[in-house]
A protein has these predicted regions:
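Membrane-embedded segments
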Residues: 1-77, 91-92
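Short beta-strands and strand-coil junctions in structured, solvent-facing domains, enriched
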Residues: 27-29, 88, 117-118, 156
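C-terminal signal-anchor/stop-transfer transmembrane helix together with its immediate cytosolic
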Residues: 178-210
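Short, hinge-like loop/turn segments at secondary-structure boundaries
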Residues: 36-39, 126-129, 174-177
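Extended, hydrophilic extramembrane loops/domains of integral membrane proteins
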Residues: 145-176
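Short beta->alpha linker loops
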Residues: 35, 57, 140, 160-164
């Protein structure tokens, strides 16, 4: 899953700051950028399904992430948008959000995940143990994802498999992994980049949607 790939990236980038914005028809900050990787992974893995409505508001999700990165003094800041849906909700156009990111020197990487079409899927709510079944519908707009990535000086990746996704995230973290070290006579302080993941994985069925 996307969570497994992100787990690996976080666990192997000690000292970097990571955050997560969840997105559907609305968006919400699950974890603001933090160097506390234990807290980050716990909150990311506990993201509930279906709490943010039906749809994919890419522009709104990006704007939420930008708001939390803009004031940072980190030397490099980036957003990784992971989505299997096209923009179909929200009042902010994705291109407008991408232009805002570029104006704040925030790099945007976009990942279109899955192969287009539908596939059966089952989900067990960890809180209630209730089992849901439905279809995972992938309909990402690669043209738009390429465009907004280019506007914000980033890159688009298409990830049809978990391996593709993992490799894309490795490339991104390698590109963004510069570390600046400042020295004084008695201390050495390492200042790392900040990165926010936006999760916009959309599951649709007659029972629930995200």
């Amino acid at each position: 899953t996307a969570k497994n790939a992100i787990n690996y990236i976080v666990e192997n980038n000690t000292g970097a700051s990571f955050g997560v914005v969840a997105m559907a028809a609305e968006s919400a900050v699950v974890v603001p950028p933090t160097m506390d990787h234990t807290l980050f992974l716990q909150r990311m893995n506990d993201i509930p399904i279906g709490n943010l409505g039906d749809g994919t508001a890419i522009g709104v999700g990006l704007s939420t992430a930008i708001y939390h990165l803009a004031a940072s003094s980190a030397p490099k800041k980036c957003i990784v948008l992971i989505t299997d849906g096209e923009n179909n909700a929200g009042a902010i156009h994705p291109e407008t959000a991408a232009e805002l990111a570029a104006s704040q020197n925030i790099t945007l990487y976009t990942l279109g995940v899955g192969s287009k079409g539908s596939a059966p899927i089952e989900y067990i709510d960890p809180k209630t143990n209730k089992k849901y079944s439905g279809y995972l519908t992938s309909s990402f707009d690669s043209t738009q994802l390429k465009l907004i990535a280019s506007i914000a000086n980033g890159r688009y990746f298409e990830a049809q498999t978990l391996n593709d996704l993992s490799l894309a995230l490795l490339v991104i973290t390698k590109n963004e992994s510069t570390v600046q070290t400042y020295h004084s006579r008695t201390t050495s302080v390492e200042y790392y980049d900040k990165l926010i993941f936006i999760s916009a994985i959309r599951l649709s069925s007659s029972c629930w949607r995200i």
